[in-house]
Amino acid sequence: MSIFKVSMTAINPKDESRRTPPVEVLVDTGSENSWMPRALLLDAGITPRGKKRFYMANKQHIEREYGYAILEAKGHETNDEIIFAESSDMSLLGVHTLEGFSVAVDNVSQRFIDIPAVPVPANVLA
C-alpha cells in the first residue's frame, strides 16, 4: 500500500466548464474509490446517482452517495465514480482512478509512472 498527496479536480461531465477547485487528496492504493468533499462536488453540478456501503478500518459500516465525474490529477484524467465525502471523511484518490489514469505508483519518489494500456486479445474473450 502506498499513500502520498496530490492535487485533484473533479469536472462535471455534462458541463466541463463546471469543476471543483483543486483538492489535496491522498493517493491511497488501499482504497478502491476516490472521495472528494460533498459540497464541492455539488457546487460543480455533479449529482449523486446512488449509494454505496463501505466497511471502514475501524470496523464501522457507513453509506455514502456516489456520482460520476471526470477526475484530473498530475496531467492525467479519466471518467470515474466519485464518492461524496462527508466532513468527517478523508479526500482520496483510489486505485480505480489510478487504473483509469493508466499509471502505477512509485512509493519512493511519490509520483505516478505512466504504464501502457494492455489490450485483451479477441481470442481470450471467445
Residue ranges, per PLM feature:
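Pepsin/retropepsin-fold aspartyl endopeptidases
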Residues: 1-126
